[in-house]
UniProtKB/Swiss-Prot annotation:
It is found in: Lysosome membrane; Cytoplasmic vesicle; Cytoplasm, Cytosol. The lineage of its organism: Eukaryota, Metazoa, Chordata, Craniata, Vertebrata. Component of the TSC-TBC complex (also named Rhebulator complex), composed of 2 molecules of TSC1, 2 molecules of TSC2 and 1 molecule of TBC1D7. Interacts with TSC1 (via C-terminal half of the coiled-coil domain). It comes from the Eukaryota. This is TBC1 domain family member 7. SUPFAM superfamilies: Ypt/Rab-GAP domain of gyp1p. Non-catalytic component of the TSC-TBC complex, a multiprotein complex that acts as a negative regulator of the canonical mTORC1 complex, an evolutionarily conserved central nutrient sensor that stimulates anabolic reactions and macromolecule biosynthesis to promote cellular biomass generation and growth. The TSC-TBC complex acts as a GTPase-activating protein (GAP) for the small GTPase RHEB, a direct activator of the protein kinase activity of mTORC1. The keyword Repressor does not apply. The keyword Glycosyltransferase does not apply. PANTHER family: TBC1 DOMAIN FAMILY MEMBER 7. It holds the Pfam family RabGAP-TBC. Residues 50-231 form the Rab-GAP TBC domain.
Length: 293
């Protein structure tokens, strides 16, 4: 048996016995052992494969710039991040903006506002739309990242990536959604147009909040692997796949309001399948990055 055929046999075997991704995990571990992390290779890996949960926070921190590439500086940098976290926390406590009763995601929001120079004069002021986005993302991140210091920094840098790197791309996603839905199921798109629903779909939930509060975190983190590593376009294919999955239900609804309400509260039990199919769709239309571990 040649090396290639042995590798293929192992991959098929691993998949059949429930160990899909064993070789991918080994490849990632090799990448993470480098003295200097190769950010480009980590991006490529994250685009191509789901990250093992035990390495997700580390990879996200590297890709979001929270950690520098050099391993020997990681503990020093995270000690600095931790000190900064506690300094901001202390400042907010002193001015009585937060207390022990403040929900953790709201604490992260106030920290972010203080760092950004956007802390309102009173905690009772209504939240701005951008604050609601941060809050939704931070709530989802809490379920994915155990350590509170990591959770704050990842939430903060994830949102900054949306606001900076993806600032021009995000407004284009509704149009791309329409384009790809038309390619996958033109009849379904026609139904949405007939109901005048296309402009009223929950685009903010999908493309601003990146499905936080829509999909369970266990499924959502596989989508965010792609967002963190450089592709906000994956969000389009998750939206398309949601429509395809619930086509029968959506086709039976005859008003924009009913369609939107349903899509804002989709059943959770199909989420893993939706995300897997969405990633396949994304690879089908956008290609698969070449893995170069």
């Amino acid at each position: 048996m040649t090396d290639d055929s042995q590798r293929n046999f192992r991959s098929v075997y691993y998949e059949k016995v429930g160990f899909r991704g064993v070789e991918e995990k080994k490849s990632l571990e090799i990448l993470l052992k480098d003295d200097r992390l190769d950010i480009e290779k980590l991006c490529t890996f994250s685009q191509r494969f789901p990250l093992p949960s035990m390495y997700r926070a580390l990879v996200w921190k590297a890709l979001l710039g929270i950690l520098p590439p050099h391993h020997d500086t990681h503990s020093q940098v995270m000690a600095y991040r931790k000190d900064q976290y506690h300094d901001i926390l202390h400042a907010l406590t002193v001015v009585r903006f937060i207390s022990d009763a403040t929900p953790q995601a709201e604490v992260y929001l106030r920290m972010y506002q203080l760092e950004s120079g956007k802390l309102p004069r009173s905690p009772s002021f209504p939240l701005e739309p951008e604050d609601e986005v941060f809050l939704a993302i931070a709530k989802a991140m809490e379920e994915m990242v155990e350590d509170s210091v990591d959770c704050y920094w990842i939430s903060r840098c994830f949102v900054k990536q949306l606001n900076n790197k993806y600032r021009d791309a995000l407004p284009q996603l509704p149009k791309a959604f329409e384009q790809y839905l038309n390619l996958e199921d033109s009849r379904l798109l026609s139904h949405l147009k007939t109901c005048s629903a296309v402009s009223k779909l929950p685009y903010d939930l999908w493309f601003q909040r990146c499905f936080a509060g829509c999909l369970p975190e266990s499924s959502l983190q596989r989508v965010w692997d792609k967002v963190v590593s450089g592709s906000c376009k994956i969000l389009v294919f998750v939206a398309v796949e949601i429509l395809l999955t619930f086509k029968i239900k959506v086709m039976a609804l005859n008003s924009a309001e009913k369609i939107t309400k349903f899509l804002e509260n989709i059943p959770q039990d199909s989420s893993d399948a939706i995300v897997s199919k969405a990633i396949d769709l994304w690879h089908k239309h956008c290609g698969t990055p070449v893995h170069s571990a």
